[in-house]
Amino acid sequence: MAKESSFDIVSKIELPEVTNAINIALKEIQNRYDFKGSKSDIKLEKEELVLISDDEFKLEQVKDVLISKLIKRNVPIKNLNYGKVENAAGNTVRQRATLQQGIDKDNAKKINSIIKDLKLKVKTQVQDDQVRVTGKSRDDLQAVIAAIRSADLPIDVQFINYR
């Protein structure tokens, strides 16, 4: 087996799934008794979620509803970075959550060090917002996948282009 095998480690969020989860969460918020008459809303602005509600307690409830819907749609909630709760217009509070797409340099270094610690015959390359792993043995590549899945990374990762 002279041919090398490879796969890419990426961190992606499917934006259509996020939109679907927001729509389902908004329907639930409109129908829930404890949200009657409140100004609760969820908006998607490019790659940022904006949560708006009357007070911090209701904002946390909106966040819980949204997270439950995101989980049902298989959207990784590890990739949501929440900002501070801030006051908004009309006696409401707002919180922004950025959707992290891609693997940044720090997390790429963590992934690289996890792979190096395995001491397998594989090579890694950081390419923009993904990490490519190549090796001659498919068993080594599967061991790398298992090690990265078991590692406690601050972002959710997917494995694509397994060749």
UniProtKB/Swiss-Prot annotation:
A Pfam family: DUF520
For this UniProt record, give its keywords in alphabetical order, as a comma-separated list. Answer: Nucleotide-binding
Recorded hits in SUPFAM superfamilies, A to Z, give: YajQ-like
**What GO cellular component is one of the record's annotations?**
cytosol
Q: Which residues form a coiled coil?
A: none
Role according to the record: Nucleotide-binding protein.
Q: Which PANTHER family match?
A: UPF0234 PROTEIN YAJQ (PTHR30476:SF0)
Q: Can you say what this protein is called?
A: Nucleotide-binding protein Bcer98_0876
Organism expressing this protein natively: Bacillus cytotoxicus (strain DSM 22905 / CIP 110041 / 391-98 / NVH 391-98)
